[in-house]
């Protein structure tokens, strides 16, 4: 973000009377996914940078339930008397508003990622809703689709296995596929169905697609890595090898599969940084280190970074991001970010 990507100048007149030692929580889907584990590892790195132990980061695991997400956050607000900072993926977009309103009403602070409705903005809620970060998934998903279509020889049938239908990233990743299809008239989208980001559901859905479409399927576009693992299992069960498949998230297992040629591509969103910086924004706003309403809008709603990973660069990518996790300055809030969110 050019000149905007500088650490906040702490101290001096920026400091305000606020919460001296806020409890810190991350509200997220599950620990079964390498993606969410990496998000949490970022949150743990943030609390360790504050001289706290990893287990001082409270995990509010919603198990894919928006109702549980909201209930757990309300319980945490009650337990802490609102003296807390929360990082959160609201699970689906409509749930973000009741979550951030509950946080505001308790006098706590929250930063969100991925899911919110387009009409909900931090500056409309106030300083207690510090920031929202998402990732601009449409273009990277279009890139993976083009890689897939080239591998298919520009013809044949493709199926898409998506995330939770109401999730912003699920919508954007399917849109990316559809954008790429416009340039490939000889490729047919046979079907697109949600697999809820889940490996088991990915296996079941791919098995169903194979039953319905058989050898009409010549390529598979997956909304995340977990789904792709399930697709590979379903194909293996039918003795199908070398099916072109693309995925998304850049998890370690997926990068290994890219290096082995079992996946054509995945997209990395740096969840470790995302998990740490989202918690950091909420924490430092809560302590009064900065006042969100004094920041420009591109610091309240912004895109996170994305990196396309293909076989030719997978080894270098693995060495840079996975073999040793980079260390980050958790006060450099917007360093790797990618500009203000744009709405259609």
Where are these regions (language model features)?
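Flexible loop/turn connectors
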Residues: 240, 246-309
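Flexible loop/hinge segments that line or gate small-molecule binding clefts
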Residues: 99-139, 157, 251-257, 263-264
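N-terminal export signals
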Residues: 1-14
């Amino acid at each position: 973000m050019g000149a905007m990507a500088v650490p906040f100048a702490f101290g001096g007149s920026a400091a305000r009377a606020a919460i001296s030692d806020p409890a810190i929580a991350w509200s997220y889907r599950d620990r079964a996914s390498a993606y969410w584990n990496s998000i949490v590892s970022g949150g743990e790195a943030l609390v360790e940078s504050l001289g706290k132990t990893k287990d001082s980061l409270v995990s509010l695991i919603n198990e894919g339930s928006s109702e549980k997400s909201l209930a757990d956050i309300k319980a945490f607000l009650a337990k802490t008397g609102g003296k807390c900072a929360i990082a959160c993926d609201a699970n689906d977009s409509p749930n973000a508003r009741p979550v951030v309103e509950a946080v505001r009403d308790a006098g706590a602070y929250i930063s969100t990622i991925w899911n919110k409705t387009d009409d909900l903005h931090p500056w409309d809620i106030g300083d207690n809703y510090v920031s929202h970060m998402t990732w601009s998934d449409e273009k990277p998903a279009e890139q993976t689709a083009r890689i897939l279509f080239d591998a298919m020889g520009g013809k044949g049938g493709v199926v898409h296995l998506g995330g939770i239908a109401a999730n912003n990233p699920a919508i954007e990743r399917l849109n990316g596929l559809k954008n790429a299809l416009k340039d490939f008239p000889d490729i047919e989208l046979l079907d697109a169905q949600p697999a809820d980001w889940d490996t088991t559901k990915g296996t079941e859905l791919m098995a169903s697609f194979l039953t319905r479409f058989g050898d009409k399927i010549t390529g598979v576009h997956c909304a995340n890595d977990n789904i792709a693992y399930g697709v590979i299992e379903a194909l293996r069960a039918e003795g199908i090898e070398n099916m072109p498949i693309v995925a998304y998230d850049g998890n370690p297992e997926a990068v290994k599969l890219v290096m082995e040629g079992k996946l054509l591509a995945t997209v990395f969103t740096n969840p470790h940084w995302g998990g740490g910086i989202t918690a950091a924004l909420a924490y430092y706003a809560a302590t009064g280190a900065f006042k969100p309403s004094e920041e420009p809008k591109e610091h309240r709603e912004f895109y996170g970074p994305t990196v396309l990973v293909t076989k030719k660069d997978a080894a270098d990518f693995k060495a840079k991001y996975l073999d040793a996790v980079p260390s980050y300055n958790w006060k450099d809030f917007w360093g790797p970010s990618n500009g203000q969110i744009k709405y259609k």
